C-alpha cells in the first residue's frame, strides 16, 4: 500500500468516526472535493445575485454612503464564520447548524435551531428564485410571459419564472450529489470570472472618485429618531441579505472528502471572496454611474439599469446573463443546504414523516423525498407571497430567522467556553485564546443585527398602500409565531418520537459494547 493510499484510508476511517460519534452510520456518498465545498458556500452567498437584487434598496435608503455597510457586515459575519470554522472541524456532519447545536446544548435548542434554519432556507429558496424577474426580461422581452397590461404582470411573471427554476433545482438535487456539484462548480467558476470582468469594465468607466462613498446622496433623515444613522441601519439590509449562508460549505460534510480540513477553509474563502468581489462591484458601480440621482437606480433592478447605461446593450447583456447563471446556482445551493438540514433532522425522527424524508434513493444516493417536498413547499410560498408587501415581510423574516439560528449556535458555544468544556479538534481549526473574544463579538453582532432586521419600520415592512399594522410588526410577529408554534409542536408531539431512524442508526459491534455488560447474541 502506497503512502497516498494509506493516507486516504486513514482519512476515510476518520470520516466514518465523525458520523459514528452522533450514532449514525454512513448513508450519503462521499464524492465532493475542496472546490465543490467552496463552491457551495460562495454560491449560497452569490455575489452577483445579492448585489444586483438589492443595490437599489441600499442606494435609495442611504445614498452612496451605504457602501460602508458592506465592510461592516463582513467584519461582523467574519466573527460568526470563525466560530463556525471551529465547529466544522470538530463536527463535520450534515445539517451543520442543527447538529452543532445538539452537541453544544440540548435536544430542544438544537431542534429550534434546525427548525428556524429550515423554514428560513425554504423561504430563501423562493425569494432567490424571484430574482430572475429583475434580470431575464432585461435580457429578452420574451421572458415577460404575462402581458404588461395585465394587473400585477411583473409579480405574476416573477412567480412563473421562479417556479420553473425551483422545479429545475429540485430535479438536479434529486438526481445526484455529483451532478449538483458539477453544475454548481461550473456556475460558480463562471460567476467569479464574470465578477472580475465586471469590476474591470466598471473601473474603466468611472466618472467620479472614491470619495463618493462619503456622500449621503441628499437623503432626508430629519424625521428619523437617529437621523442619518437610522437611514444607514435600514440600508444595511442590502448587505445583511447577502453575506450569510457560508455554513453551507459544512452542510455537505458527509458527502465531502476530508471535511475536517476542507470545510473551515471553504467557509472562510467563500466569505472573503464574496466580500472583496462584491465590495469592488458596488464601489465601481457607484463611481461609474452616469447620474446617481436617476430614480431608476433606486428602483427594483437598479444595478441592472446602471450596467446597461455604463456598458451598453451588448456587453451589458452578457453580464446580465452571468447574473442569471449566478441566480440559478445560488438557488441550487440554497436548495441543497435545505435538503441536508431536513435530512439531518428527519434522520433523528425530528420532523413529521421523518422516516420518509430521510430515505436515501438507492439509485441516486440522495434524499429524493426531502428534495421534492422542499421544492413543493417553496413553490406554494411563491403564490402565497404574491403580494409585493407580503413578499417583503416574508423574505425579511427569513433573514431574521437565519440570524436567530446562528445565535442558537454561538450562544451555547460561548457557554461551553466559559465553563471550560469546549474542546476544539486538536489537529483541526482552532481560534486558541482568541476564541472567547471572537465568540462574544459574534453574539453581540448577531443580536444587534437581529433587532435591527426585526425593528418595525414603515419603509421596510409597510412601505406601500394599503398600510396594515400587522405588516409593520411582521418582523416580530411572524418569527414569533413560527418559532412558538414550531416549538410547541416539538415539545408536545415530536420530542416523544425522537431517536435515530433504524435505517441510519449505527450498528454496534461487540467492540462498541461496554465490557461490564454481556454481549447479546443475535
Label the predicted regions.
Residues 1-65, 78-82, 493-522:
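Membrane-interface "cap" regions at the ends of multi-pass membrane proteins
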Residues 4, 98-102, 129-160, 194, ...:
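Helix-loop-helix connectors at the membrane interface of multi-pass transporters/channels
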Residues 23-27, 67, 143-157, 186-317:
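Helix-loop-helix junctions that connect adjacent transmembrane segments
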Residues 26, 157, 169, 186, ...:
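C-terminal membrane-solvent junction of multi-pass transporters and transport-like membrane proteins
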Residues 47-152, 273-276, 280, 474-482:
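Extracellular loop-to-transmembrane helix junctions
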Residues 99-101, 106, 137-148, 218-223, ...:
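TM-loop-TM module centered on a large, flexible mid-protein loop between adjacent transmembrane helices
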Residues 157-214, 244, 267-271, 395-408, ...:
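Membrane-interface loop-to-helix entry segments
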Residues 392-405, 433-522:
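A generic transmembrane alpha-helix motif of multi-pass inner-membrane proteins
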